[in-house]
Amino acid sequence: MRNAASVGLCVGLSALGAAANDILKPEADYRDFRHYQLNNGMHAIAVHHPRSNESGFAVAANTGSLYDPQDVPGLAHFLEHMLFLGTSKYPEPESYDSFLTESGGANNAYTDEEKTVFFNKVTDSSFEEALDRFSFKSPLFSRQYEEKEVNAIDAEHQKNIPNDDERAWYSIRSLAKGPMSRFATGNSSTLSTTPKAKGIDLVDRLKDFHTQYYCGSNMVAVTISPRSLDEQEALIREKFEGVSAGHADWLGMVQCPGPMFDTVKPFDESNTGKFIHLQSFSSEPSLWVAFGLPPTLTSYKKQPISVLTYLLEYTGQGSLAKRLRLLGLADGLSPVVDKNTVSTLLGIKVDLTQKGAAHRGLVLQEIFSYINFLRDHGVGHDLVSTLAQQSRIDFHTTQPSSSIMEEAAGLAHNLLTYEPYHAIAGDSLLIDADPRLTNQLLQQMSPSKAIIAFSDPQFTSKVEDFDTDPYYGVQFKVLDLPQHHAIAMAVLTATPNAFRMPPPLMHIPKASDLKILPGLFGLSAPELISDQGGNAGTAVWWQGQGAFALPRIAVQLTGNITKEKADLLSRTQGSVALAALAEYLQEETWISKTAG
């Protein structure tokens, strides 16, 4: 925003008219949920939200940019823009937006690799009409709005061009085999200039795409409303049963095809072990190390990628992040992940200092030394079990979202991706604390299987014979990682005592049956519970549990200086002292933040 075959839509389907709460929900969530299926194969979730005066709803299709035809990049995104510019029942192109304005509503949509999600909210009194207008039946795809929406998409893309992170990640993906390498957003060239030059009728292609993928068994719907579950289900059945179930095949069986993109393995020895040197539009250099790993979506109960990203972004004693900071090579480090049904692309982005940019070979040595260290020591069950415990606490203390339409969008996306029972939890809940899959993935993270990208502000003064990307305009050069470098880094051992395995999480509740204590809410004013007085000047106040029943404590430290010391120099010294204290406490505060 991803094979004549795809991951099956909605594994473990429930019967029609299922009972409420046939979906795992947080203990802190007071609402009722229901998963059900329409006669046309469409799956749906209804959420009874008794405390809301709005209704939110979302519809998602199991298709996205990886399904784009090779000769029209951006077609899935273009369909997202064109779908609600008039239907046979409501032909005026602006009628849906006008209706939302009049009913105090809002809407949005997005297209990612394998999903297209449309989401809305309205006042509850307008809920039924909103669903009728939104029911995906007989869109007109009016040609008179083709140019306008192409221009809107082109404007979106133009805003992305200066983003160094987006351009670096795109340069890495562009080396993949199959549709992962393609330009996903679309622009005026791919959606107008080139199709016209080739005699391609864009609207006809749009209609074919819609007919192929927007059918009942390839779609889901979610409603969140103060109305009862039965009433919501009845409305969805009334408004969406008319969506086509699919197409009759030669045996007369109704079919709604899944993804039709190439199932080729995106990354292998032919396109890894590469170094991409690319132009940066920023003054800040960055280094990226990415690995094309096997798909992990179906392993969501074990969360191997979440465990890996925790290991990589850990900033405590003996961490990669701390090591790079101590050496003056980097200011920060963050993992980046793309997951789809054919691959998991895991990246490590390092924000380099000027020293790091000049010595990026040393940065790579430290990165692969750390990965080798993790692989040699192995991820233990103790750490993963505490990550699982923390994920359970986070999940079961989750309150209903303040954005009813964003929550509907998330549920719709999850219903297309995970078992219906886990549509709320998605990939946020580590259910099976088994580190074996994580350790297997670490075995594949070697230099010869990596793609390394260096985003360089001084690119043009250093590189000759470069290429220019046609979509982002970025100048770049792709080189093979020298074999002797790859072999050397694959067997690097860390400097003694440089790295330590992250310990099990601290500061998390051990009990799994936490209860809300009575009488902790509604304090009229904070209560003083400790006052050291004197020169120490330390006081501790209790302000109650707050608005949310969460098993955590918040500590705020406030320092004051006397009036006679409030001059510019003293304030500057105070700011420097606080910054130094924050740096000194970074490890401990990171560990605490990890625990919620």
Swiss-Prot record:
Binds 1 zinc ion per subunit. One of its GO terms (molecular function) is metalloendopeptidase activity. Keywords: Hydrolase, Metal-binding, Metalloprotease, Protease, Zinc. The active site is at residue 80. Zn(2+) binds at residues 77, 81, 156. GO terms for biological process: proteolysis. Its cofactor is Zn(2+). Its EC number is 3.4.24.-. InterPro entries: Metalloenz_LuxS/M16 (IPR011249), Pept_M16_N (IPR011765), Pept_M16_Zn_BS (IPR001431), Peptidase_M16 (IPR050626), Peptidase_M16_C (IPR007863), Peptidase_M16_M (IPR032632). It is an enzyme of class 3 (hydrolase). Gene3D superfamilies: Metalloenzyme, LuxS/M16 peptidase-like. Signal peptide: none annotated. It comes from the Eukaryota. Pfam families: Peptidase_M16 (PF00675), Peptidase_M16_C (PF05193), Peptidase_M16_M (PF16187). May be involved in the degradation of a protein which is a component of the signal transduction pathway regulating oocyst sporulation. Belongs to the peptidase M16 family. This is Sporozoite developmental protein. It comes from Eimeria bovis. The lineage of its organism: Eukaryota, Sar, Alveolata, Apicomplexa, Conoidasida.
